[in-house]
């Protein structure tokens, strides 16, 4: 049953500033009724106000969170690399990949739940939100057990297929099995963080991530450097941090979003809600898994060019990752913006958001790409002093970074469409540009003797993806979306959004 919360109405006559303040107060009271949320939460209103401002406020904590994650990865590598041997370092690096492949599908399902939460939030459907959260938690426990078992017993076989060096194999199995015990915490934290983002609260997910990263770093130093536990210590630190972040996210949600009645343990589910989560989440999860496998295929072409070329591509990835942080942040904002405004029936605002947020992402990444390209050699020199490695890294940077803006626009458009729940088209496009464009182009360039320029396939796939997503807005599917939004009720006529 939907909450009986009237939508804000336009006000005529009187002082415009007073009317706007009164409108804002009524809207704030409505969203508090829906979630039962405390006034100090970091929830961003995506349905009203300046589109760019709300998207930027939402994206900024995610951007900082991505930087934190990269910082943690660097510290983790430094600790293991300095207090363990090279075999242990190799084991930690390789053992994470099987877990990522196993978790991809289920993390995609979590993203599906986040999209549905944003849509229910746009509708102000309190009962729907509560049942959706219960169903997501129930499904979380259902998934955690088989994934843990698969990781424990199938993981070693995956490590053999990856040709893990013999001296690192036992370490890798140990790391994999200990971190597999953290599957429930991993899936739980990502599910809860997705729900909070769906509500528009990205600031809280940053704080939760900060707690997790700091815990992980402190325990890494304690277990590996102080207690000398080696690989087992690094794995245990990761597992404890995952469970702490999961439990903290539950406590936070129960305190600040009382209306959601956030459960710790499974407490019933709704078949229709579960079917909706799977309908959106399974294609996203399969897309993630196949995309990961596809990256391995492209990496194989890079490996054929020799260790110097691979090293160059590796450090160039650090620089291109700067633009990647901005792209991920804008794309996350696009998903939630689309979901909430579709749920509220704000089709015209949704149209403006597609243009404004994708253009903002394109401009920001274009500037980052140009600056990083111009100063790429001194930046890359921070990671290596080998002239041959630097030459390969500079070549990679020049082939990719100047065109990274096309990926930003393409990815934001794709995120908008995902936010509306139309994930089939984006899944097909994503797999098409990887398996029909990027991978064949890389192997063709290698076969023609241009293997050291095979990274050009990346920029080519970005351009094809951009054209494919532009084509979506000419398809009947976009027209269906417009009719769906109209059925939900167009609230844009009552909007008093400031002019940008």
Task: Name each model-derived stretch.
Residues 62, 66, 78, 115, ...:
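Transmembrane alpha-helix boundary and packing residues in multipass membrane permease domains
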Residues 57-76, 178, 189, 212, ...:
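Transmembrane helical elements of multi-pass membrane transporters/channels
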Residues 110, 178-197, 205-213, 234-249, ...:
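Short runs within selected transmembrane alpha-helices of multi-pass transporters and secretion channels
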Residues 71-90, 159-166, 222-229, 289-322, ...:
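Helix-terminus/linker motif at the lipid-water interface of multi-pass membrane proteins
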Residues 68, 72, 102, 106, ...:
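Residue-level hotspots within pore-lining transmembrane alpha-helices
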Residues 89-149, 186-205, 312-376, 407-429:
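Small-residue-rich hydrophobic transmembrane alpha-helices
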Residues 4, 11-59, 117-184, 226-282, ...:
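Short alpha-helical transmembrane segments in multi-pass integral membrane proteins
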Residues 46-83, 97-112, 116, 141-148, ...:
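N-terminal transmembrane alpha-helices
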């Amino acid at each position: 049953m939907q909450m009986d919360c009237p939508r804000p109405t336009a006000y005529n006559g009187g002082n415009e500033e007073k009317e706007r303040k009164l409108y804002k107060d009524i809207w704030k009271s409505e969203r508090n009724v829906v979630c039962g949320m405390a006034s100090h939460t970091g929830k961003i209103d995506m349905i009203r106000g300046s589109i760019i401002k709300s998207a930027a406020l939402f994206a900024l904590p995610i951007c900082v969170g991505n930087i934190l994650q990269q910082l943690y990865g660097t510290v983790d590598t430094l600790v293991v690399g300095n207090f363990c041997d090279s075999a242990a370092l190799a084991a930690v690096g390789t053992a994470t990949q099987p877990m990522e492949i196993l978790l991809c599908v289920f993390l995609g399902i979590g993203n599906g739940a986040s999209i549905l939460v944003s849509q229910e939030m746009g509708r102000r459907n309190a009962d729907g939100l509560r049942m959706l959260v219960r169903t997501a938690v129930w499904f979380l426990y259902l998934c955690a057990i088989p994934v843990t078992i698969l990781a424990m017993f199938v993981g070693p076989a995956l490590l053999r297929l990856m040709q893990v060096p013999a001296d690192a194999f036992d370490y890798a199995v140990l790391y994999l099995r200990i971190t597999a015990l953290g599957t429930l915490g991993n899936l739980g934290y990502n599910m809860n963080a997705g729900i909070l983002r769906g509500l528009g609260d990205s600031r809280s997910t940053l704080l939760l991530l900060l707690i997790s990263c700091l815990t992980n770093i402190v325990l890494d130093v304690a277990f590996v450097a102080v207690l000398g536990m080696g690989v087992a210590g690094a794995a245990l630190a990761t597992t404890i941090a995952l469970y702490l972040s999961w439990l903290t996210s539950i406590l936070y949600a129960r305190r600040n979003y009382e209306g959601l009645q956030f459960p710790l343990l499974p407490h019933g589910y709704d078949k229709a809600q579960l079917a909706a989560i799977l309908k959106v989440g399974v294609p996203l999860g399969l897309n993630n898994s196949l995309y990961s496998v596809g990256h391995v295929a492209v990496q194989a072409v890079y490996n054929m060019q020799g260790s110097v070329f691979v090293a160059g591509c590796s450090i160039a990835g650090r620089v291109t990752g700067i633009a990647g942080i901005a792209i991920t942040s804008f794309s996350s904002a696009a998903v939630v913006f689309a979901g909430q405004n579709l749920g509220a029936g704000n089709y015209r605002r949704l149209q403006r958001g597609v243009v404004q947020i994708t253009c903002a992402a394109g401009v920001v990444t274009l500037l980052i790409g140009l600056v990083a390209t111009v100063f790429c050699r001194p930046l890359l020199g921070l990671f290596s002093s080998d002239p041959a490695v630097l030459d390969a890294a500079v070549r990679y940077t020049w082939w990719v970074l100047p065109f990274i803006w096309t990926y930003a626009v393409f990815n934001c458009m794709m995120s908008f469409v995902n936010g509306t729940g139309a994930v089939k088209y984006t899944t097909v496009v994503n797999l098409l540009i990887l398996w029909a464009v990027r991978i064949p182009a890389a192997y063709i360039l290698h076969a023609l003797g241009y293997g050291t320029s095979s990274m050009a396939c990346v920029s080519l796939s970005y351009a094809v993806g951009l054209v494919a997503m532009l084509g979506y807005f000419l398809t009947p599917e976009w027209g269906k979306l417009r009719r769906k939004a109209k059925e939900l009720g167009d609230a844009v006529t009552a909007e008093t959004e400031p002019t940008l």
